[in-house]
Regions:
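Alpha-helical transmembrane segments and their immediate juxtamembrane cytosolic regions
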Residues: 3-12, 17-414
Length: 414
């Protein structure tokens, strides 16, 4: 039933043109490439398949080398944030831009609160009554510290349960984005990028642990570091800043990414192939030993940045080959990425519940879970994609943007 409904919605979807789109409402001319929306949709599909505990999970976990859906999702989210809100800063000023970003962060925070209460009020009860170890493990601090403290810490974004820990990361980056854009406008991006790189470098040498120790000693922080999320915020902020920088340059039509890709695609291919070989050799037993930190996902090790840049260069260089992959379901998912991203966690909880005492789901239930998950996510995307496209982008604007198909790109004009 879910599959039939979602396929019907897909066929009936008329507000997503087959080419790129032209949207009015922001002023000036901006091109939006539908393949980038599709890329965000693909990151969500990839992330969902990685999180659902099925037999294909090991096969979709970093299959292209030392790169995961998280890098792509964070970078693309930052790319759109930089592009859209840099234009708002130029057109409407710092106040309007900050307010719009605050509202978007508030929307994400509301979704996060809903997911937290689903976890604490529904999942926690099922974990105890059903003796489900998978669900119990993701909420172990909730059970150890007690509901009152766990809920308070989670609402303050201090306690970040597994699975849900990327949302506080995203929220913090959104809240810091206005300051980043304003500072970049005043002092230039080179200083912002330099400072961000320095913080990332510090994160590779224990900055997170050092700051945690200081906070525990002087601020009374009494939550284990591992309960504050797997992602090292001090490292991952560099990926966000890089994405915002590219987005701001894109907004100014000053992002010669095709030219860059043409120059570097051969060494990029060699790097990507080498790291892919290392990745699969490691899976077969290669011990990286003291080098593992250079490949670490949670601390965004240097080889992950190199791998990401190499694959990005190849995708840009051969975009004509991958552009046909920008099919309407992926575009739709990408255009409602915020809501789809949050909704997929519900099905991850369901998957963990179906696991019981095993390490993953077997047999027909895994197929049913995957089909129902993506059918439901398409319904979510259908509901919210039009709202995301048509949301007024300017201060004081009550007019809904119009959408027109063009041969290439999209423009927003008042």
């Amino acid at each position: 039933m879910f599959a039939w409904v979602s396929l019907s919605l897909w066929r009936d979807e008329t507000n997503i043109p087959t080419g790129d789109i032209k949207e009015t409402g922001l002023g000036g001319s901006v091109k939006r490439r539908l393949e980038i929306d599709a890329a965000r949709g693909l990151m969500l599909v990839w992330m969902t398949l990685t999180h659902l505990p099925t037999l294909i999970t090991p096969w979709v976990n970093q299959p292209f080398g030392y790169i995961s859906a998280s890098e792509g999702f964070i970078f693309l989210s930052a790319l759109f944030t930089g592009r859209i809100y840099f234009r708002l800063l130029e057109r409407d000023g710092a106040g309007a831009m900050t307010w719009k970003l605050f509202l978007r962060a508030l929307k994400l925070y509301r979704y996060h609160v809903v997911l937290l209460f689903v976890a604490f009020l529904v999942v926690a009860r099922f974990a105890i009554s059903g003796h489900n170890q998978g669900l119990y493990n993701i909420l172990d601090f909730y059970f150890a510290a007690g509901p009152a403290r766990a809920i308070a810490d989670a609402l303050l974004l201090v306690y970040r349960p597994p699975l849900l820990d990327i949302i506080p990361l995203y929220l913090i980056f959104l809240l810091l984005s206005p300051l980043t854009l304003i500072a970049a406008a005043k002092i230039g991006w080179r200083y912002i990028l330099g400072a961000s790189f320095a913080i990332w470098l510090g994160a590779q040498f224990g900055l997170r642990q050092a700051l945690y120790a200081l906070a525990a000693r002087h601020l009374g922080l009494h939550i284990p570091l591992n309960e504050m999320g797997a992602f090292n915020l001090w490292a991952w902020q560099f990926m966000w800043i890089l994405g915002m920088w590219c987005g701001a340059r894109w907004a100014k039509d000053d992002l010669p990414v095709e030219k860059w890709a043409r120059k570097v695609w051969i060494p990029a291919a060699l790097v990507a192939a080498t790291l892919l070989a290392v990745r699969y050799t490691e899976l077969r037993g290669l011990n990286l030993a003291g080098w593992s930190g250079l490949f670490d996902k949670w601390h965004l090790g240097v080889f992950r940045l190199i791998n990401f840049a190499a694959i990005a260069a190849l995708l840009v260089r051969f975009q004509s080959v991958v552009k046909p992959l920008a099919v309407r379901p992926l575009v739709l998912l990408g255009q409602a990425s915020l809501q789809v991203f949050c909704a997929h966690f519900v099905f991850c909880f369901v998957g963990l519940g179906l696991m019981g005492g095993g390490d993953r789901i077997f047999g027909w239930p895994q197929l049913a879970l995957v089909v129902c998950t993506f059918a439901s996510l398409l319904v979510v995307a259908k509901v919210f994609a039009r709202q995301e496209l048509n949301a007024p982008q300017t201060r004081g604007s009550n007019a809904r943007p119009t959408v027109k198909a063009t041969a290439r790109g999209y423009s927003q004009a008042s």
